[in-house]
Amino acid sequence: MVALIIIVVLVLWICVSCIKIVPQAQAYVIERLGAYQSTWNVGFNLKIPFIDKVARKVNLKEQVADFPPQPVITKDNVTMRIDTVVFYQITDPKLFTYGVENPMMAIENLTATTLRNIIGDLELDQTLTSRETINTKMRAALDIATDPWGIKVNRVELKNIIPPAEIQNAMEKQMKAERE
């Protein structure tokens, strides 16, 4: 009798563990015996016990990556620090799961190198005044580069441009003189 109860409980547990409900704005990447099988979208799904495995739960909402200030050098050899924010969305859960080892680190490194390339073509004055142009160029470059990873870059913002202290002091003195 005890063995029958254990078997019934075990069978019920296996049946319940086969039912997976994927919540809104998420997708599950499924592997069968270690190989990619499919991507489950929102709703009710059944998995084969002991054979299918949820490899990754992927958030499909727009996400924000806030990176620490990056040192960059302008065309006129001024070193400044720029703080960036990247708004992105995962468009292909399979590519996101298998496309790159650590997507967040890859986006951070890609953002830093792209920022250095763009700022390296601009002088200090241009960098301080053409924030929108820099944002647009960065978004376009990052979106193309992250496409093979299943990521769409929606927006890039330069949160803060921090010039060197001596240049910042000179700018403050000039603004003070203009006000007087």
Regions found by a protein language model. Name each.
Residues M1-I19:
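Single-pass alpha-helical transmembrane signal-anchor segments
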